[in-house]
């Protein structure tokens, strides 16, 4: 298997070396000069950690560690049954200022097909809930947020499927969304389940609009990340910078994915 130009054993070795070199830091990242916001994508694995414990408070603590202005969560609702939301959103709002983008028809769920988009400032102008093709119930949540009187940001929160063919079809749907909307600064945040490169990769499909693609940052599995399943991408050059995994003792156990963070300049 080839991952970002390296073999899997090489990637594992680099991950081990990098883990030894990194110092744990549970405080929010210091904002780089010129950055307008901190954004993140986090597959919370239904709030079940690597210790197999269901602990939504622990998930919320990881979000507090990150200190994001916008964060896309995946697997934040039960997948079956009543698909109830798993987080205490009222408490998260009280402690972080983050509120969910509203969705319709979700019953007891927080979001759309497990996708929850939280933001700290601005006003939601428009929301689209997109069903993505494939055997699994995957979706994308598209929100346009007026940050102030002059700036509007479009955010696409998505969780692509496990099957390569499904991912390719789903990536094309994401591009269709972009082509059907007015041109504006757009972020794609999500678990794309894609680490391979090449013509058959969903990343290659997305590259036509979300380019240049930021460097791949391994986020899975959280204990020893070797696969860059999670991505933060933008449709404008220089909009996304300093993409990093939020790697702390807490985040390593809270989910099977590490959160991915980045700075955004508009």
Which stretches of residues belong to each language-model region?
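Active-site beta-strand/loop signature of hydrolases that rely on acidic residues for catalysis
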Residues: 38-44, 59-84, 154-158, 170, ...
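Transmembrane beta-strand segments that form the barrel wall of outer-membrane beta-barrel proteins
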Residues: 129-130, 156-160
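Metal-dependent phosphoester/phosphodiester hydrolase catalytic core
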Residues: 151-153, 160-165
């Amino acid at each position: 298997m080839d991952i970002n130009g390296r073999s899997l054993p090489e990637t594992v070795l680099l991950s081990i070396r990098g883990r030894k070199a990194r110092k744990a830091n549970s405080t929010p990242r210091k904002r780089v000069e010129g950055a307008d916001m901190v954004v993140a994508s986090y597959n919370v694995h239904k709030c079940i950690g690597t210790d197999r414990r269901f602990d939504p408070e622990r998930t919320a603590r990881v979000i507090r560690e990150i200190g994001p202005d916008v964060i896309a969560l995946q697997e934040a609702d039960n997948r079956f049954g009543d698909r109830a939301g798993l987080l205490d959103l009222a408490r998260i709002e009280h402690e972080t200022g983050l509120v969910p983008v509203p969705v319709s028809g979700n019953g007891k769920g927080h979001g759309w097909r497990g996708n929850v988009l939280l933001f700290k400032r601005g006003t939601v102008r428009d929301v689209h809930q997109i069903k993505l093709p494939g055997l699994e119930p995957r979706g994308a949540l598209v929100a346009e947020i007026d940050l102030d009187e002059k700036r509007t940001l479009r955010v696409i929160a998505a969780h692509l499927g496990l099957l390569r063919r499904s991912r390719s079809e789903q990536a094309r749907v994401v591009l269709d969304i972009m082509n059907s909307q007015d041109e504006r600064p757009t972020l794609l945040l999500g678990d794309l389940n894609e680490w391979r490169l090449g013509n058959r990769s969903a990343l290659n499909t997305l590259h036509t609009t979300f380019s240049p693609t930021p460097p791949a940052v391994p986020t899975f599995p959280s204990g020893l990340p070797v696969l860059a399943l999670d991505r933060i991408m933008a449709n404008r050059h220089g909009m996304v910078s300093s993409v990093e995994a939020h790697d702390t003792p807490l985040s390593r156990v809270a989910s099977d994915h590490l959160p991915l963070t980045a700075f955004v300049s508009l």
